[in-house]
Each structure stands twice: as structure tokens, then as C-alpha cells.
Amino acid sequence: MQGLYMEQLALVLQGLAGIVVLAPLFLLVLLCMTSLIEWKLGEKTTAWACLIAIIFGLGAAWGIVLIMLGLDQRQLVLIVGDWVAMGSYHFTIQLVFDLLSVPMVILTFLLCGIIVAFTNRYLHRESGYHRFFVFFALFLAGMVVAALAGTIEMLLVGWEMVGLSSVMLVAFFQERPQPIRNALRLWVVYRVADAALLLAVVVMHHQGETGTGHLLWGESSWPQKPAVLLPFWSWWVGLLLVIAAAGKSALLPFSGWLPRAMEGPTPSSAIFYGALSVHLGVFLLLRLGHLWESIPSLAYLLAVLGLGTALFAYLAGSVQTDIKSVLAFASLIQVGLIVAEIGVGWRYIPLAHLVGNACLRTFQFIRAPSLLHDRRRMESALGGHLPRPSEPFPLARAELRLW
């Protein structure tokens, strides 16, 4: 009876895992196909399709959480199949549900659901309404694949999907030249990060015959995962992955693209550069926490890089005149601090910091278009103009810019 019960439970887990991954992929296929055959869905239909996919994915993710709690397991690894199987070489498609991937997936579905509800009104009757949701579905699918990736090859697939959707939404307003130029600049930076990640994959493929999940992800649950690569190769692979994360998360010296990415619509700025996409590099660093523990020089580099990025973002944000740029640099300050926390050896604190920062920035970005309206309403209630912040309170002003 016990064996039959476990078999049935395994089937349930496989079904739930399939829903988590396939729901956003099905949404992407649906929106792409309707665009290709020039059969555009109505605005309400498009929004409801996105919400239904998100609800199914979120419900399945919570179902997996309940099963993990019931079994008292910290990690569930589901092997879907093989990418390549040639002789002794086989690279598997794995989905990993653990203390890092599950919070990231749930956060992704929750924030994306909020953005769908906001965008349905924000882009009402915009000519690019349907195009926005096509790239949004691509982003959602990429984030889910990257978060659940059991090997770095799978993470690379999700990584590329997120990068492509980011660039396309920066260039959303195609009638103006500046968004196109900024999107090309972002594309160049992302190509550098992608090249570093791809080189790391190539190096690791020379170290084993079973894909890179065994070499980097390890067999035990996060964050207790041993480093498997040889010390020499670990250092070079780690450096390449730091470069990849720096490009994706706008760390120094790649921070210049972040304010330029604000050319996109506010919903994409919120979910990409305030909440999720900008934290994808941080997620990669968190996933490989054991690697930094085994290489103190790279851990020190992460701490210095994170603090340097936070300082730069604070100074740059203090002179911005656009609210979206101010929020982008405020988010970058927190990203830098999270990277520094990873560098000093913390694991759960950076994860909680990531979740909190993503939620806060999403709220701030979607409130940004109403800022002037809120100020005028407050002035009307007070019967006059609001006073400007006075100089005797520099600490308070610094805290406002920081958070």
C-alpha cells in the first residue's frame, strides 16, 4: 500500500509540475498563434487568458508546496527527459522544487498577475496592447523555466527568453527613435552576459558527461550543496557566472543600461527592472552559493561589487529628475546590497530581501503614473502647496532615496 501511495503521489507531483511549466508556455503559444494568423483576441479575452494561465500555475505551485510540507522534504527533483543522449553523454531536463525555486516561482506568478490586472487598464486601446502581452507571456515562461531549472542548460533557455522579452518591451514605442536605441544598448549588454554564461556552460561540459546539473546544482538540497568542479575550473566558471549575473542585474560596470530601459511602458518597467528580471542574476548567484563558499576570492569580489553598485546607484539616483529612473536606481541599490549579502555568506536573508524588494518596487512603479495626481489631491486637502524637503534633514532624504 505504501508503494502504491508513493507512486500515485509521484504522478500527482508530475502533473502539478507540468501545469506550472506548461501553463505559461501554453499562454505564449496561444498569443503567438493568434498574432501569426492575424486573429487578434479582444483586450478582455487576452487579459483573462493571462490571468487563467497564472492562476493555474500559481495553484499548482502551491499544491507542490503543500505536498513538500506533508512529506517533510526540502527538495523535489523531477526528471522530464533528455536534451541529448549519445552514448555515455546524456543531458537531462530536470525541474527542481526547493527552498529557492518555489518562492521564486510563486513570486513570479503573483507579481505577473498584478501586472496583468494593471496593464489591462493602463494600455486600454493602445495599438500595441496585444504585442505587449505576447512578450509578457514570453517573459513569464522564461522566468518559470529559469527558476525551476535543474541544470544550467535549462536556466540558459529561460535566461534567453527573459532577455529577448526585455529588449522587445524597451522598444515597445516603435514610433520614437530613442526607445529603439536604448533597446539596442540593452541588447549589447545582454549579449555580453549571455556569452559569459554560455562559456561557463562549455567549460562545464568538458568536466562531465551528464550535463551541468551534477557539477553545479549538486545532489543535496539548497543551500547545502557541495562544489563538484575542480578548484581551477571552479574559479574560472565562477568568474564567468559573476559576469553573466552582473550584466543581467545591472551591476557595475553594466549599470548604465538600467535608466535607459525605462523607455518601455510602466508595467514592463515594474515587472522587469523593479521586480523580477533585474533579480534574475541575483537568483543565479543565490543558486550557486556553495560555489562562492569554496572560492573566497570570488565571494570577496561579490561583496565589493555589490557595495560598489549600491553606492553608485545611490549617487546616480540622487540626481534623477524622472520618477521611474529614481525607482530604478532605488531598486539597484537593494540589488547591490543583496549581492553583497551573498558575498558574505548569507543565503536566507538575501532571498527574503529579494522577495521584499520585488514586491515593494512593483507597487511603487504601478503607483508612479498617479504621483502628480496624488500630490495635487493632497495639496487640495491641505489648502495649499506642499513644502519642499528642508536641508536640516539630510538623513531622512537619504533614506527616501535609498528605499
Q: Model-predicted segments: where are they?
A:
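...captures the hydrophobic TM-helix bundle architecture rather than a specific catalytic motif
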Residues: 2-403
